[in-house]
Amino acid sequence: FYLIKAPNGKVLEIKNFNTENGAAIRLWDYAGHPWQQWQFVDAGEGRWRIRNRFTGKFIDLALGGVVEGTWLHQWGRTSGLSQCWELESTRNGRTRIRNVLADKYIDLVGMNTSNGAQAQIWNYVSGGNQEWNLVRVDPDTAQTNARAEEKRDPEPTPSQRKHQNDLVR
């Protein structure tokens, strides 16, 4: 599992640890909670679905929107491209996360970096508000989901191993 961490150290999380479809994705101080942890699931062709550890749901585009300002929320797995993301390395070692359907990047509404800032998609802009640090979470020390069987990350797929440098920052 990974944290999707902003340059200021805050992370993307599921708002109020809500398990329902449509729950918002926002920025918040990292506290080790499983609703702040994400698994990158290989979707083929260099694409990833981003699954929340706590809810098991995926980062998705609200209402399937593709315009600037479309909010991010969580939703159960679909076959649509609104849940598919590509990772792009930046010169400073961070990662941009681009939605395949919308061809836009994970961003924060109003470039707000305080607790509660809503995640959205936006066209490429030069700046830190679209750059993320993907930080691996140690499964033995992080808080875990209530599911007792979930103790370790599963073995990576060949595609995940190939792109592992993209995921570890």
Task: Cite the ranges covered by each PLM segment.
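Surface-exposed turn/loop modules enriched in turn-prone residues
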Residues: N21-P34, G69-T78, N123-G127
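Intrinsic disorder/low-complexity segments
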Residues: S79, N123, P154-P156, K162
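Extracellular glycan-recognition/adhesion modules and their associated mucin-like linkers
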Residues: F1-T19, P34-V66, C84-T113, E131-E149, ...
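Low-complexity, intrinsically disordered Gly/Pro/Thr-rich segments
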Residues: A117-I121
